[in-house]
Amino acid sequence: MKTIIHNDWQTVLEPEFAKPYYGQLHQFLKQEYATTTVYPEMHHIFQAFEWTPFEQVKVVILGQDPYHGPHQAHGCSFSVLPGVKVPPSLKNIYKELQTDVGFNPVNHGYLKAWADQGVFLLNTVLTVRAGEANSHRQQGWEQLTDAAIAALSQRGHVVFILWGNSAKAKRALIDESQNAVLTAVHPSPLAAYHGFFGSKPFSQTNQQLKQWAMTPINWQLPQDVSEQK
């Protein structure tokens, strides 16, 4: 079988790649990328998986579908490429980080430093048509990302951070006897004041990792990401 992800995720998801729904999704995407503008760029679709191998995942921050503006999405939930303005939801995540763990603000939204430590930045849908939120829902991505969540749950000792209703709906896939689940409203400007601010997900994540005798996450991002492209 063709290699889609260049680490242990390939083996974990190989059964999914062989199923009819994935073949249909592949055909749909070929057509979409050929005829319209789709984000992220094709080579970035599986970036979250490439950055954080299966056996290294400690934390999952679950997003919905990718940012649908130009130059924003690069395959990782909430993250944007260097040089791109920090989107409103991520600004609110940074505000909560400041009050929760004393995060020093940065002027970029490139979250690779988290991914490198085992924070899996997964969207439930991995592509989107430009300017059309949710336009690639129900095409097969959910089945694939559900399989990824279920595999991590089975492996155990993962903190799942679920913000907003569509992320919370994935709770049913998670075995809470051997994993931890933290939920709050979505950090978008519309919802953040209704329970996102003050939810302390970052310090709670690290408390849980310490209980499992795992190294906590250093949530501080580097001030300069020009070197990390």
Curated annotation (Swiss-Prot):
Active-site annotation: 65
Keyword Lipoprotein annotated: no
Cited CDD domains: UDG-F1-like
Domain of life of the native organism: Bacteria
BP GO terms, sorted: base-excision repair, AP site formation via deaminated base removal
Keyword tags: Cytoplasm, DNA damage, DNA repair, Hydrolase
Localisation: Cytoplasm
PANTHER family assigned to the protein according to its UniProt record, in alphabetical order: URACIL-DNA GLYCOSYLASE (PTHR11264:SF0)
Protein name as annotated: Uracil-DNA glycosylase
Organism: Latilactobacillus sakei subsp. sakei (strain 23K)
Lineage of the species this protein comes from: Bacteria, Bacillati, Bacillota, Bacilli, Lactobacillales
